[in-house]
């Protein structure tokens, strides 16, 4: 607004937005006396703004988290990340981290997406550092569609090794980027009426992902157990998924679960006992949906996609993941 002496008073609302656009309108900043944050040579200024410094600091934190538990030879460097981002060299990325350059919001969003960083966290410091798919799917079939669109090179079925024994899916898209899916699946006896169906739906999801992706040159499927604290950090996006999932033993719990192979689950731990019980419940639900073709069409469709037989005279000992692809199912003994 204009004062009586002819000067102007500028009241700024939404400073983040103003600061982000000053570099595009430096002439206006000078004209209206905003010399404190802009000067005639604004585009060449090396002094970082507060917001740019904060964004740069968060990006540096994200890279540090990405390198947690990685060996020297496996570390993500500014050079390797810059090459992945398509930058001509490492200098631009270094400048972003130092908060020096005039970088547009769209460029920062592209950096976040390419590295699997949460955009809101990078730009505003909200939520958690790493990308978690927030969708609340109506069923496992919808989650399959989302995973398929990402075309991952590795899929990991992560199960909590204690308490509720929940499971989530994490997908490695490329050497840098992971996506953790927030939608959790039951893998224990801690289920009600709906949860019983969700057990079989998760079984079908795993089978369908295997039958779609797991072949030479495509995608690798693996399993992992995590203690509750680490599981919750992964689920929330507080930790880079590769920290827990980059290396390590491939836990075959997911194969036993997907093949409904109760007899293969060994051990006396709570985790093993609950997995056996989850498989038993899922087998009961499966038996209730194997029958005349006019019955429960929505579930039959999922069973067909998962390679499950829908007209069974008796239950099988287990249902191989590649049933109908390369080998026949193994019938129950006796």
Q: For each predicted feature, which ranges?
A:
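A generic structured-segment signal
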Residues: 118, 129-130
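Intrinsically disordered, low-complexity tails and linkers flanking structured cores
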Residues: 3-14, 18-21, 25-53, 131-334
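Recognition helix of helix-turn-helix/homeodomain-like DNA-binding domains
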Residues: 84-103, 110-112
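Conserved catalytic/binding loops enriched for acidic/polar residues
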Residues: 126
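Conserved hydrophobic/aromatic packing and binding residues within compact polymer-binding modules
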Residues: 59, 78-82, 92-96, 122
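A short, Lys/Arg-rich alpha-helix, primarily the initiator
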Residues: 32, 37-80
């Amino acid at each position: 607004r204009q004062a009586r002496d002819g000067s102007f008073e500028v009241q700024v609302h939404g400073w983040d937005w103003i600061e982000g656009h000053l570099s595009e309108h430096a002439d206006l900043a000078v004209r209206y006396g905003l010399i404190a944050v802009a000067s005639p040579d604004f585009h060449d200024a090396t002094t970082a703004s507060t917001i740019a410094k904060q964004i740069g600091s968060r990006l540096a934190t994200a890279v540090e988290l990405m390198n947690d538990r990685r060996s020297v030879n496996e570390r993500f460097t500014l050079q390797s990340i810059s090459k992945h981002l398509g930058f001509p060299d490492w200098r631009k990325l270094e400048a972003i981290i130092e908060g020096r350059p005039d970088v547009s919001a769209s460029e920062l969003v592209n950096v976040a997406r390419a590295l699997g960083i949460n955009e809101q966290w990078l730009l505003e410091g909200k939520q958690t550092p790493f990308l978690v798919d927030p969708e609340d799917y109506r069923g496992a079939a919808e989650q399959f569609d989302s995973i398929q669109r990402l075309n991952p090179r590795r899929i990991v079925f992560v199960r909590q090794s204690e308490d509720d024994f929940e499971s989530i899916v994490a997908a490695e898209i490329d050497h840098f980027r992971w996506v953790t899916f927030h939608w959790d699946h039951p893998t224990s006896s801690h289920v009600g009426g709906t949860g019983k169906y969700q057990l079989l739906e998760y079984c079908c999801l795993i089978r369908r992902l295997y039958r779609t992706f797991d072949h030479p040159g495509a995608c690798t499927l693996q399993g992992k157990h995590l203690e509750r604290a680490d599981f919750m950090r992964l689920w929330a996006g507080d930790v880079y998924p590769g920290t827990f999932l980059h290396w390590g033993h491939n836990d075959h719990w997911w194969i036993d679960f997907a093949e409904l192979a109760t007899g293969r689950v060994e051990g006396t731990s709570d985790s093993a006992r609950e997995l056996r019980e989850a498989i038993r419940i899922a087998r009961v639900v499966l038996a209730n949906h194997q029958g005349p073709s006019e019955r429960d069409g929505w579930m039959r469709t999922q069973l067909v996609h998962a390679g499950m037989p829908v007209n069974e005279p008796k239950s099988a000992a287990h249902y191989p993941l590649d049933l109908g692809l390369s080998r026949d199912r193994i019938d129950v003994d006796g």
